[in-house]
Amino acid sequence: MKNPDKGYRRLNDDLRHDHDIHVNDKRILRICRARNIQSTIKYSNQGCTRQAKNPQYIAENLLNRKFGADKPNEKWLTDVTEFKWYEGVEVHKIYLSAILDLYDRRIVAYVIGDRNDNPLVYKTFDKAVKANPGAQPLFHSDRGFQYTNRVFHHKLEKAGMTQSMSRVAHCIDNGPMEGFWGILKRERYYGKRFTDKKELVDMIKSYIRYYNTRRVQRNLGVLTPMEKHEQYLAA
């Protein structure tokens, strides 16, 4: 099977998107069972970032789980997640900071670094602003230390953006962002043991490119994030 991470629903979405073949999910499920085709995805519980110890700025939860958007750059979500790679018995970590657009679910910008620190988040934000000049979305995050410091809040104000934050220990308040981490890790990371940092970094970069341009989503009308984005721009 070329893409062992795909279950029957995603296989059906690909048939519709790539080949204009329209059948119901149950038929695809029957075929998969008859041919012993099943997804190799492994599931794992996700952690939840809690409030920084000494937050300098706390914003209200203005997003309030309203995960819909009428246009690109109306609402952005952000977060940082970690990945491990191994060198003998030594465990190393790298960190991925990303910003997701709620309209088309595209990854607007991302940065990979060796440290989970303020510069990682600042660089991600700066990349997003540079790629989307004039954008003034509602900017939502958890209450991690990177997002609750005055410097970051000032960067948002300077860009004309309004800040929103999840409540403490309420991962669902940043649900679509957490969901993206889950998708990435289930499809390309869990069940694997990376022993080379470059291989892990290349995997992340390749997956984000695949996610934005090739991975169709049913909630986007069986389109990829970039197809949804370009469809709006062409309207």
Residue ranges and their predicted role:
Residues M1-K71, H170, T224-L233:
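Basic, flexible linker segments flanking DNA-binding modules
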Residues D104-Y110, Q163-S166, Y190-G191:
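Short small-residue beta-strand/loop micro-motif enriched in glycine and branched aliphatics
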Residues P4-Y8, N24, P55, A59, ...:
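Hydrophobic (often cysteine-bearing) scaffold residues that line and stabilize catalytic clefts
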Residues L11, I28, C32, L63, ...:
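Mobile genetic element proteins and their domesticated derivatives, centered on retroelements
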Residues H92, Y110-N132:
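Active-site beta-loop-alpha junctions of metal-dependent nucleic acid enzymes
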Residues A52, S141-R143, N149-F152, Q163-K185, ...:
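RNase H-like two-metal-ion nuclease catalytic core shared by retroviral integrases
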Residues R65-V108, D114:
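An active-site-proximal beta-strand-loop segment
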Residues E157-M161, I183-A235:
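C-terminal domain-tail junction helix/linker
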